[in-house]
Amino acid sequence: MLTLESVTKRFGGLTAVRAVRLEVRRGDLLGIIGPNGAGKTTLFNVIAGYYRPEEGRIVFEGRDVTGLAAHAISRLGLTRTFQIVKPFGNLSVADNVMIGALTRLPRVRDARVEAERVIALCGLGPHAAARARALPIGLRKRLEVARALATRPRLLLLDEVMAGLNPSELTGIIDLVRRVHAEGVTLIVIEHVMAAMMRLAQRIVVLHHGEKVAEGTPEFIAGDRRVVDAYLGEEFVLADA
């Protein structure tokens, strides 16, 4: 479904992503982990068309999308969320989601129906009329996912949707990610909440200093000495034992 061929992104003299190769199959739920500054969000921005790579190629569903603008890639069915959520604060939850739907469904009636479906899926029904700026962080995270889903992606990139959530909110967002995946959406998830990632992901990729240093099942990654030393730490291994 998605292939990255030696993708490299530089900012001046800094190489943020270095020769990353990746293969994502339809139906995958792939996790990406790594320390702060490892290049995870930059990689998302390159995949989704916000940054153009200096080297390498990105192929989505058989089409070379390297260098395409983000809006063009989104229309093809590849969309991302953002770690720092910025909804239209003065608009209602329903209107925020409708804006996403209108990018794929030009008729307002159709967009409204799609928005209602996505709002229900994301558990935002009781808050549909609320202004986005009034939502607590847990609901704003759900709204960010809903806005992306309204564009009808086949591949969705989720950037730290669990960050800053309390245990109850975390449980809810994990359930939401599972529901979205069950709807047939292929997912790539960046996350620092490792206990959740270990339960959710079918496969995990580890980035360190912009390079892919490991890839495998959660069990394999938890036992990889390079990953433990660079990121997870002995405390995680002992807690998971």
Segments from the language model and where they lie:
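Glycine-rich phosphate-binding loops of nucleotide-dependent enzymes
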Residues: 1-241
